[in-house]
Amino acid sequence: GATYTLPNSGTGTLYAQWQINTVTLAYDPQGGSGEPSDQTGDAASDVTVSSTVPTRDSYTFTGWDTVADGSGTDYSGGDTYTLPNSGTDTLYAQWTPIVALTYDPQGGSGEPGDQTGDAASDVTVSTTEPTRDGYTFLGWDTAADGSGTDYSGGATYTLPNSGTGTLYAQW
């Protein structure tokens, strides 16, 4: 500590000197890449959440969250975030898998191309009909033997939560 000599008469006054903590907002891409740079600022001050969008193969970026599993507070680019009083806060990238719907012509040809979308999202079944010599196309089904759910072109199909959904041509 420093030494302070009191004056011979009167009162000596000491003044406290304070410095505001510099704190950090970090971004964790959770398997992605291209995350924003960390942001620093004064403790308890507001910063704008970065609009830089990370990428991850086979996933769609859905935003940032204060908890890795997405159970915290959601943030998007441009939102205001209040920095902590000390240390570092982290925002975690949130991802939705991109899944596919494929069409199996079961011996036919000219089937529609695969469709992709976010997990559990709706897509419209293609109106493109495959052909097969000597057969009439009856529609699509989720089971090869026709025992699943029937779909016709233009119907709404909900993509699976992961992997690939397949519709089989029925003849």
Features from the language model and the residues they span:
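Secondary-structure capping and domain/repeat boundary segments
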Residues: 1-171
